[in-house]
């Protein structure tokens, strides 16, 4: 596991410890790997999920650090979303 993935998993675990999420989501970080959130658990995996977010390392770092709103990233084409948009919106509220 790369340092970038390890840092992202840690950042997501911290966010999820303070919030509730009742779905599954995958973050595909270009050139690094994938992270899954299932309920409030965060781990590395490439399993199928309700929704998948795809972006570069830089974009995910900005989102995880609270520097970039996920909705803005999606609307400007920096973040790609495949799957259930309702689940995507619920998870975006966690980052809100």
Predicted features and spans:
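Feature captures hydrophobic
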Residues: 1-96
């Amino acid at each position: 596991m790369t340092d970038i993935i390890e840092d992202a998993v840690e950042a997501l675990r911290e966010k999820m410890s303070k919030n509730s999420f009742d779905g599954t989501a995958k973050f595909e970080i270009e050139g690094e790997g994938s992270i899954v959130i299932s309920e409030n658990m965060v781990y590395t995996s490439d399993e199928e999920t309700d929704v998948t977010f795809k972006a570069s390392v830089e974009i995910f770092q900005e989102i995880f650090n609270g520097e970039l709103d996920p909705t803005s990233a999606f609307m400007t084409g920096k973040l790609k979303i495949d799957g259930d948009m309702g689940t995507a919106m619920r998870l975006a509220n966690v980052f809100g």
